[in-house]
Every structure is written in C-alpha cells, then in structure tokens.
Amino acid sequence: ESMVIIGGSGTGKSVALKCVLGLVRPDRGEILVDGAPQGRDRDAFLARFGMLFQGGALFDSLTIWQNVAFRLLQGRQRLAKEEARAIAVEKLRRVGLRESVADQFPAELSGGMQKRVGLARAIAAEPEIIFFDEPTTGLDPIMSGVINDLIREIVVEMGATAMTITHDMSSVRAIADKVAMLHAGVVQWTGPIADLEHSGDPYLDQFLNGRAEGPIEAVR
C-alpha cells in the first residue's frame, strides 16, 4: 500500500518519518511497526526500511554503484564487492539508467539522474518499507512524471509498503492509495485517494485549492 502525507511546510511531515526510524524521539505515545515496537536490535529494524531522500543524499566521493550498494557493503552480512556491484547495476537498470553510469560520480549526473540513483539505492536491499521524502522536488514536470511512475511500479512490483511526503498534488494522485493531511503535528484527515476531492474537511479543502482563507493560517 502507498500512503502519501501532505501538508504545509513545518507541519511535522519529515519529523513523522524520523520518529518511525528512531532518529527523533516522540514527545509522547509509541511507534509500532506491524503492531510491534522497534525492539533492541536497531540494525535489524532499520534493515526493513529503504529511503529516498529529498536532496538525493548521494556520497560525492563514491561512484554511482558504490552509492547504490552502500548498505550491501556494510555490516555483518555485507556482500562481496563483485556481488554488490552486480546488484547495483541491476537496480540502476530498473530505474532506467545504463551500466555505463555505474562508474561515474554524482557530480557528473543531472538532477533527475541523481534522483533515480537515490531510488535505486532505496530498493537495493529489497526493503519491506520505503520512505520517499519529496521525491519530485526540483525536477521538471516530465521528470517528475517519470519518477512518480517508477515509484508506483516499484512499490507494486516489490509488494512494499510506501510512505511519501510531498507538496506536489500531481504526485499524490499518481502514487497514493491513501492520503493523510497533517497540520500542526496532527493528522486532520486520512482516507483513500478516491475521497480526496470531496472529503468535506476544511483543512484539506483549503490546502487542495490553495486558498489563503480557512483554518490554516496563510502566514506562519
């Protein structure tokens, strides 16, 4: 299932992801994944997740294949270099990049290509859960459509659970099964994508229509 979280800047969208990953401790309550708390084996917990970062977060000093295979080369169960490279090349192909890109460095690629590399890295270890943080920010409409299509295809193909943060309503409509509207750290509305346009929720209605008047203050 693909859940998309929408909401204005500073409403807590990225913080929500960081809380799930254990990077930020929630003020109250608890985080359950498949009905269970994080547990003591943090490495095993994090191994269930993949993440596409907003800015790509590629390592400038590593080649593209080394970026994609970064997790595969770490920890107790790290793979041999040759095996990790082969998996990286396979994932690069899956996101539409040729093998010739594998030995280049991030600075040699366009923004759209870097975003694809980030996506390849997010799926390299076959995670159960994938987080996408503003996946189309900074991309032109055509490349945004390409990334949205890839996200949708890969999530369905892998049978993964996906959670995406975005301001881009075209992305919401392209990749969401369900949507959650976050405001001031509170989920104001959640429901299937089919109910988005006629939710009856004043917060969601104001956000979708870009109106200054409504329960969301235009100046924060």
Features from the language model and the residues they span:
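Catalytic Walker B motif of ABC-type/P-loop ATPase nucleotide-binding domains
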Residues: 130-133
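Conserved catalytic motifs of ABC-family nucleotide-binding domains
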Residues: 126
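Conserved ABC ATPase signature
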Residues: 105-109, 113
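Helix-to-loop junction immediately C-terminal to a conserved catalytic motif
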Residues: 21
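Conserved ABC transporter NBD signature motif
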Residues: 29-37
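Conserved ABC ATPase "signature" region
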Residues: 81-100
